[in-house]
Structure formats: structure tokens, C-alpha cells
Amino acid sequence: SCTVTEKRNGSYELKLICPADGIHAEMLEEGHVILAKPSDTMQSQPFRIYKITTPIDGKLEVQARHISYQLNFITVSPFSVSGCAGAVQGLKSHAASDCPFSVWTDVASSAMFTVSVPASFRNCLGGMDGSVLDTFGGEFEWDRYTVKFHRARGADHNVHIVYGKNLTDF
């Protein structure tokens, strides 16, 4: 079985359980990439294996993080800019090493964004005071090697949850 779990503006991980003597089990190694389809509406996403355990029942338990976690290893130099579009583009242009990710946003804001000390690209996006998420609000979507920062992810279908009508119990 394979389960992908994505938390809003948080973790994005894969858990795979398969027989230790399964068809491609020998190819599962830490650092390797698994391409998995997180949902019916999304394209397959790459996940890098970070942990493999073998419980007593002879099955491998593989844990992997979305490829976007590579952004933890890309350092961004200090800079300051106004606007969300300028902020996400500035992160890419001030990266200290090659950054294979593209960035995109639909957030229209003229707020100031500042990286005052060198920090990881992913922390600059969300995970520290003054991050893109902290400064502009919004929701991240990790789509392969594209970082999308939405004003609001998904759609509002104008459905109200009312106790006793469409909610019967807690």
C-alpha cells in the first residue's frame, strides 16, 4: 500500500509498505526517488526516500518526502523587496546555488519582504518569522519542481455546515 499525506502549508510525505521480496524491493534505497500519484486529480509527484525499516512481518516500510524538501539545502542570501511576486522571484535569484525549482504566485500585495540573514529557501517560504507565508498569507502547492503560492488553494463551493442538517454528530 502507498499513502501520500499533505498537510496545508506543512508536511508532504509518502508511506509505502511492500513485501521485502517484492518485484522492485531491491531498488528501494535511501536517497532514491519514488514517483507517486497523490490523488486522482494531480499528476504524479516525486518523493525522495529518507527512511526504510523492516518490521518483523517481512514487509518494508518506506518513508519519503516530496522533492520540494530539497529547498532545505538551498541557501538564500539577504535581500529586501516589495510585493509577493518580487519576494518569490527574489528567493530564486538570491539562491547561493543552482535552484531547479520555478516559483509562481497569484498573491497581489505590496508588503515589504526581507531576508535579513542567510536562510534556507524552504524556511524563507514558510517556517520562520518574516517568511513569505508569514508576510503575505496564502497556501502553498508543491507541484513537482514548481512552487505555487496561492491566495487560496481550492474552490469555495458556498456550502454551510449546519448541526442537525448536514452534520449529525461530533
For each predicted feature, which ranges?
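A generic "functional-site adjacency" signal
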Residues: 10, 43, 58, 125-126
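Juxtamembrane "anchor/assembly" segments of surface/extracellular structural proteins
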Residues: 1-28, 65-71
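Short, ordered beta-strand-loop transition motifs
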Residues: 4-13, 51-60, 141-145
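Intrinsically disordered, low-complexity sequence elements enriched in Ser/Thr/Gly/Pro
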Residues: 6, 46, 149-151
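Charged- and aromatic-enriched interaction segments used to assemble
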Residues: 59, 65-170
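Short, acidic/charged, Gly/Pro-enriched secondary-structure junctions
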Residues: 19-54, 82-98, 130, 134
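Surface-exposed or flexible loop/turn and strand-edge residues in extracellular/cell-surface modules
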Residues: 11-13, 44, 156
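Short amphipathic beta-strand/extended segments with alternating polar/hydrophobic composition
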Residues: 1, 46-50, 158-166
